[in-house]
From Swiss-Prot:
Coiled-coil ranges from the UniProt annotation: none
Segments of skewed composition (Low complexity): 174-187
Protein name: Uncharacterized ORF2/4 protein
Compositionally biased intervals (Basic and acidic residues): 157-173
Region: Disordered, residue numbers: 44-190
UniProt biased composition (Basic residues): 129-143
Biased composition (Pro residues): 48-60
Length: 274
């Protein structure tokens, strides 16, 4: 059965309990004052005792061990068992239980225990005592290598841990100009010479190289001037006569219409051509 939250809080539950008691009293009595009825019953009958278990007379009462006497030389404390409150019940049992725990609640530490405690406080290595910190949460731990590192990794760690300065890098005062051998080595490292591939299999013959005979594909090839046919010039002549324009010397040029008015075009907004 699944748990459901209560429908009422503490005040609501007390109100429901009070109403149920009133209704149960009104079911068998018509006095109308169940509080006074309960008070009269309490004066006449007294405090009700807890119910006895069925199946015969109750067993013998359990006897509680008395408290141990206080140690010699220690100040005597006030014990609650000496002046027990009236009524007994659970309070008496709790007092006797506290007093019966070996006298720990009523006695002080023995001199030997005090000396051991002072010796432990004065010990220099008491901070090395292992402490139980409880279960450790799940978190990432950085793994550290305690052995010797390679020179390359050592340089990386040195550069990572070094603080960077905002000032520009300065050359050392003792730094001399690079020699000719150093400049040659630097140039050789910057411009490596292309080394052709070497055939690793000495038994096989070398692979011959053949010249390329396929045409070269260029992005902007050099085109030869197009040769126009007689039919192309006849079509150009007919088009010039129909649209009343001069013929073009090169058919790839845009045509020109002299009778068309000229317009000034601008991409600016609000431009008024004059």
């Amino acid at each position: 059965m699944s748990w459901r939250p209560p429908a009422h809080n503490a005040e609501g539950q007390e109100g429901l309990w009070y109403r149920s008691v009133c209704q149960s009293h009104g079911a068998f009595c018509g006095c109308g004052d169940f509080v006074g009825h309960l008070n009269r019953l309490a004066e006449r009958l007294g405090r009700p005792q807890p119910p006895r278990p069925p199946g015969g007379p109750p067993g013998p009462a359990i006897r509680v061990l008395p408290a141990l006497p206080p140690a010699e030389g220690s100040p005597r404390r006030h014990n609650r068992t000496e002046n027990q409150p009236c009524g007994g019940g659970d309070a008496d049992f709790g007092d006797q239980r506290d007093a019966g725990d070996g006298g720990a609640a009523a006695d002080d530490l023995s001199p030997a225990d005090v000396e051991d405690l002072l010796d432990w406080l004065d010990a220099p290595d008491r901070s090395k005592t292992p402490k139980n910190r409880g279960p450790r949460g799940r978190c990432r731990r950085r793994l550290t290598f305690q052995g010797e590192k390679t020179p390359s990794l050592a340089r990386l760690d040195l550069g990572r841990n070094r603080e960077r300065s905002r000032s520009p890098r300065r050359e050392d005062a003792t730094g001399a100009a690079p020699t000719a051998a150093q400049r040659a080595t630097t140039a050789q490292m910057r411009n490596p010479v292309h080394v052709p591939a070497i055939n690793k299999n000495a038994a096989s013959p070398p692979r011959p190289s053949y010249p390329s005979i396929s045409p070269k594909a260029l992005l902007f090839p050099e085109r030869l001037p197009q040769m126009w046919t007689k039919q192309d010039w006849e079509t150009e002549q007919q088009a010039a006569a129909v649209w009343d324009r001069p013929m073009r010397n090169n058919l790839t040029d845009p045509p020109f219409y002299p009778w068309m008015p000229r317009y000034r075009v601008s991409l600016r907004l609000g431009f008024n051509p004059q």
